[in-house]
């Protein structure tokens, strides 16, 4: 009885958070608190709407998700400029809000030019692709994804994500604050959450692309998926066996025969980690780069790696074993 009441109350709160544009629901606001100044919490954030969208889809309420996808697609072509510099065409906004001008409603987007630290959202376009696939799977409305403007949008995102860059890794290099929240969290580099989203977005794009140009992009996507999969599974994985290997690494190795390819220093391993990881558990590291391995456990990155099959079956089981055996540390009383 109590659970039923809580679910009913949750739905009522979700209904009150819905954003309407010209009479149609297009998203949900980040937060509704009448006692706190809104700041930008009165906007609909791309990443924040995704769990709400999945809930709507599982309950057969796909209209709001379809409207969200269409309106954010239109915002993708908005001006993305700060100090006379234009950002990449495939960029999706971090958030948007409904504004009234001359008694007419308009959607205004924030691509990071208003964010704290002025950081561009890297994850928005990745979440958008994943949500588009989820919508198609839930409704069977593949015609929406096959519309020319949607195909063009998918290719713009791929062009942005797969561009040549100064990097030897198949992972995506991103600045701090470019996902989750626009605050410094020590995640500059190749954070797991972005790699998991990147992998899921590439898999989604591969399913949704059509036509001759689509086939061309599928080949590029397939190439990246295979090397990204290998890279994450081989180098990001942490369990007791892997920790023991790192403890025996030698630093400053050079050449093709180097075992310690990322020059990880054994003394950088937190003293508590060997006691914390259970014998049957393991997880994917939070970040990896030259002389840097982030040993923090990032739940969303690991769970998305399972969801997208970026993690192997064995790794997926080990991650779930870790969460189960360290439930109090990771979940607590939530």
Placement of each model-derived feature along the sequence:
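Acidic, mature catalytic/reactive cores of soluble proteins
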Residues: 1-334
């Amino acid at each position: 009885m109590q659970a039923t009441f809580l679910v009913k109350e949750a739905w009522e709160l979700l209904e009150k958070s819905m954003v309407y544009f010209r009479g149609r629901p297009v998203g949900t606001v980040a937060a509704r608190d009448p006692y706190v100044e809104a700041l930008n919490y009165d906007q609909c954030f791309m990443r924040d709407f995704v769990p709400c969208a999945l809930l709507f889809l599982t309950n057969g309420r796909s209209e709001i998700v379809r409207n969200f996808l269409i309106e954010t697609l239109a915002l993708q072509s908005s001006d993305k400029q700060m100090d006379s510099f234009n950002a990449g065409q495939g960029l999706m906004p971090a958030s948007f809000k409904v504004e009234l001008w001359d008694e007419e409603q308009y959607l205004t987007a924030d691509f990071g030019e208003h964010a704290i630290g002025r950081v561009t959202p890297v994850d928005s376009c990745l979440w958008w692709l994943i949500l588009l696939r989820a919508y198609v799977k839930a409704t069977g409305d593949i015609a929406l994804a096959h519309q020319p403007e949607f195909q063009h949008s998918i290719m713009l995102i791929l062009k942005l994500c797969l561009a040549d860059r100064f990097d030897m890794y198949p992972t995506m290099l991103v600045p701090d604050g470019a996902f989750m929240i626009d605050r410094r969290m020590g995640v500059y580099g190749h954070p797991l959450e972005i790699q998991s989203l990147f992998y899921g977005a590439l898999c989604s794009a591969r399913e949704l692309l059509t036509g001759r140009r689509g086939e061309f992009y599928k080949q590029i996507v397939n190439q990246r998926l295979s090397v990204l999969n290998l890279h994450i599974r081989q180098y990001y994985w942490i369990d007791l066996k892997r920790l023991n290997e790192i403890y025996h690494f030698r630093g400053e190795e050079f050449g093709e025969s180097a075992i310690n390819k990322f020059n990880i220093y054994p003394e950088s391993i937190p003293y508590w980690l060997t006691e914390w990881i259970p014998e049957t558990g393991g997880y994917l590291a939070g970040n990896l780069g030259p002389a840097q391995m982030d040993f923090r456990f990032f739940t969303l990155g690991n769970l998305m790696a399972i969801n997208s099959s970026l993690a192997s079956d064995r790794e997926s089981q080990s991650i779930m074993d870790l969460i189960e055996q360290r439930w109090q540390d990771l979940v607590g009383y939530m």
